[in-house]
Structures are given as C-alpha cells and as structure tokens.
Regions:
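A short, glycine/Asx- and small/polar-enriched loop/turn
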Residues: 10-13, 168-169, 239, 249-251
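Structural signal for conserved beta-strand scaffold positions within catalytic alpha/beta enzyme cores
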Residues: 18, 43, 57-58, 84, ...
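Short strand-coil-strand connectors
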Residues: 6, 20, 120, 258-262
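Short strand->helix junction
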Residues: 22-23, 182-183, 273
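Adenine nucleotide phosphate-binding catalytic loops in nucleotide-utilizing enzymes
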Residues: 53, 187-194, 198, 223, ...
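Short, acidic/turn-prone active-site loops that include or flank metal/cofactor-
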Residues: 60-63, 178-182, 233-237
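Phosphate-binding loop of NTP-binding sites
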Residues: 65-213, 217-228, 259
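N-terminal leader/targeting and accessory segments in enzymes
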Residues: 1-67, 71, 216, 242-244
Length: 275
C-alpha cells in the first residue's frame, strides 16, 4: 500500500491526500482517486459535499504532510546520512559531486535534484521539480533504505523550503553555496529569498554546516547553527577550508585544499574556479 498526492498514481488500497496546491486543487480529483480504488482520502476541508465514508476532512492538513510521510515510510531520512544543498547556483553540481565522490570511496550514495533521483552517474530519471514533494521524497528515501543506500545528497531549493517539501527530514549536513538575485518574482525581495534558504539551517539544525565564506549572504547559516560549521574560501587563507588554485589549463584545474583534515593537492578535469 502507498500514499500519494497524485490521483493518477492511486491503486487499489492506496491513500490519496487532497490539498490545495500552488497551481492545482487536489480536492478536484477526489472522485478520480475513489474510482481508482483509494482506501482512504485525507482532504483539506471543503464545501459540504458528501463523498462517502472513505473521505476524511483534516484541518490544516498541509502542515502535517511532513510528519505523515515520515511516519508512513518509517522515518527513512533518520536511517541515512542526508546532505542537503541550498543556494542560488551550484546545487546540482555540488550534489552530483558529493554522490560521485562517495561512490568512488565505495559507498552507496543517491542524489536527488534537477537531474532526478539517481544512484549512478549518467542515470536518466524524469524530474518535475528540483526538490520532489514531501510524500514522493520520503517514498524515494524509503526505497533506497531498503536497497542498502547509506548516503543521499539532496538539492534543497528555496521553493521547496518555503513550501514545506522537506518537513520532517533529518538533515545530517547542510550546505549553502551562494546567494544572488533570483526567484524574486516568487519571494518578493532578497531578504525573503535569503530567509527561505536559511530555513535549512534554522528549522532543520543539521549536525554539520558548510557555507561559502566568500559570500556574506551565506554566513547566516553559520550563525543559525549551534553545531560545527565550516566556511570554504578561495581568497582567505585563514578560513576553515581554504582552496588555492595552482593552475588553470584547457584540461582542467590543479588546486590545493587546506582543511582541518590536512592538506591535499588535486588535479581535476573541472573547468572554472566556480567549481
């Protein structure tokens, strides 16, 4: 049995959750879900229409989705090391690099974001949103727990944080890449946009925080967390983690990383200091 926000995914015995979305009112599809065999429908309250005993109206249902998904799927994020990456730029690259590096170390790691949900680099998976809805997200994490996956790198978009798509997750590490003027049509102003990003650190209190020490807008992540925070810098040699570019060539980058774990020199096929 399963639960879903999409009536098209309902199968016999499943549960359908009907809420008012940003673009579509899921309550319009209650009859479709019932016809497909939904055992129960949880719905935000609506005008008095008797749709039968399988439809249960739940006040403020949207605010309970994270807890509902967490309990239904047996709290999968708590059984994983979940690394959530937010920022205007770099979420996809950083998440994918984390996944690749963990796999090279012999670990089982998944990535979720713009490129879809993947356990292997190059794996093509259709994705509608950078960050899936909270039900789909927990379903995916639970599936990976069953497969023995240990690590997941997740893109945490400002829209997802604002729309509670990550509610109920246990975040092991939070990463804040940078902040530039974007999505102001949705958030209204830069302060609201930054505050949406900072929800990852204020609301989820990750065990570890990594932020761009060269961008003042990301330092709120350090201030929001009582847990260890590492600032990464390309210009400040006294930063927690200092990256010194030694050479840039047509074949890639050569750089040194100075960190609390020691110093290493790396040759990379990546181009551009932004990486």
């Amino acid at each position: 049995y399963d639960i879903t926000l999409d009536s098209r995914q309902v199968t016999t015995g499943a549960g359908f959750i009907a809420i008012q979305g940003a673009q579509t009112d899921g309550r319009r599809f209650i009859p479709d879900a019932l016809e497909r065999g939904a055992a129960v429908v949880l719905a935000e309250p609506f005008e008095a229409v008797d749709l039968g005993p399988r439809v249960v109206k739940v006040p403020d249902l949207k605010s309970h989705l994270g807890e509902l998904a967490k309990r239904f799927y047996a709290d999968p994020s708590a059984q994983l090391a979940l690394l959530a990456v937010t920022g205007t730029n770099g979420k996809t690259s950083i998440s994918d690099y984390i996944g690749q590096l963990l796999r090279l170390l012999g670990e089982s790691a998944g990535t979720i974001g713009t490129l879809g949900a993947r356990l292997r680099s190059g794996e093509a998976v259709e994705s509608q949103n950078t960050t899936p809805d909270v039900i789909s997200l927990n379903r995916q994490l639970a599936d990976w727990v069953d497969q023995g996956v240990r690590f997941v790198a997740l893109e945490a978009s400002s829209h997802a944080l604002e729309q509670s798509r990550l509610d109920g997750l246990t975040v092991h590490t939070g990463v804040f890449s940078n902040l530039t003027r974007d999505h102001l049509d949705y958030h209204g102003n830069l302060d609201s946009y930054r505050n949406a990003k900072l929800r990852l650190f204020n609301d989820f209190t990750p065990d570890r925080v990594i932020y761009n020490a060269d961008d003042p807008s990301t330092r709120g992540a350090r201030e929001a967390s009582a847990n260890p925070a590492l600032g990464v810098s390309l210009v400040n040699a006294s930063a927690d983690v200092y990256v010194k570019v030694l050479d840039e060539t047509p074949t890639g980058l050569r750089f040194q990383i100075h960190s609390p774990c020691g110093t290493a020199e790396i040759d990379s096929a990546l181009h551009g200091r932004c990486h």
